[in-house]
Amino acid sequence: MAAAEMERTMSFDAAEKLKAADGGGGEVDDELEEGEIVEESNDTASYLGKEITVKHPLEHSWTFWFDNPTTKSRQTAWGSSLRNVYTFSTVEDFWGAYNNIHHPSKLIMGADFHCFKHKIEPKWEDPVCANGGTWKMSFSKGKSDTSWLYTLLAMIGHQFDHGDEICGAVVSVRAKGEKIALWTKNAANETAQVSIGKQWKQFLDYSDSVGFIFHDDAKRLDRNAKNRYTV
């Protein structure tokens, strides 16, 4: 499913359910006389009332995290400036949060903004992330907003065939541009990782090659770590 289509699907899911509750289209009875008013059925009225209050749950709960560059220093441990921002579990709560936070193009230089499955911290040391790795895409400065949104929609909408492998994603704002990284659990599972990388490129219509780096390699070799997989 294309990213734009996922966005429309999540936005109009409630409308489709309402249509189904109304018998699939709400056609006018052929025997009604001209000018006669069709009364709303009790079932439809009841469903409409529920749709106003009932939210649409996601497969998993997710948490936004912000790493504030103004509190970072070389003397503090990595991740000490991470702050839990908001946890959401429904489509409506996601949009409520997303529409009220800064998008990557508006974040300050050096900022990292994360979205991870609830109770997974965006750290290499987290038990769920420890044996994983990351796919990474690069963007020109101020050009990652749409790709960040579509990455979020693909994750929380459970669009990946190996969605259980995904821990979360982070967008990083730097002087030379922006990067989006997709974190996964089991780096050694090549089949799952390659599938995720290919689908991610497809969802974002991203044409450049992307590489996958093991967390273990990144910890040992830092910027000298090499891609283990490329798609």
UniProtKB/Swiss-Prot annotation:
Q: What is its main location?
A: nucleus
- Please summarize what the entry says happens upon disruption of the gene: Impaired mRNA capping activity. Slightly impaired growth and fertility. Increased resistance to pepper mottle virus (PepMoV) and potato virus Y (PVY) strain LYE90 but not to PVY strains N605, LYE72, SON41 and LYE84 and to tobacco etch virus (TEV) strains HAT, CAA10 and S103.
Going by the entry's taxonomy, the superkingdom of the source organism is recorded as Eukaryota
User: What happens on changing residue 54 to K?
Assistant: In allele pot1(2), haplotypes 1 and 4
Q: Which UniProt keywords apply?
A: Cytoplasm, Disulfide bond, Host-virus interaction, Initiation factor, Nucleus, Plant defense, Protein biosynthesis, RNA-binding, Translation regulation
Q: What is the annotated localization of this protein?
A: Nucleus; Cytoplasm
Output the SUPFAM superfamilies linked to this UniProt entry. eIF4e-like
Q: Which residues form the signal peptide?
A: none
Query: Where are the disulfide bridges?
Result: 129-167
State the similarity comment.
Answer: Belongs to the eukaryotic initiation factor 4E family.
Question: Assembly and interactions?
Answer: EIF4F is a multi-subunit complex, the composition of which varies with external and internal environmental conditions. It is composed of at least EIF4A, EIF4E and EIF4G. EIF4E is also known to interact with other partners. In higher plants two isoforms of EIF4F have been identified, named isoform EIF4F and isoform EIF(iso)4F. Isoform EIF4F has subunits p220 and p26, whereas isoform EIF(iso)4F has subunits p82 and p28.
Protein name from the UniProt record: Eukaryotic translation initiation factor 4E-1
Native organism is Solanum lycopersicum (Tomato)
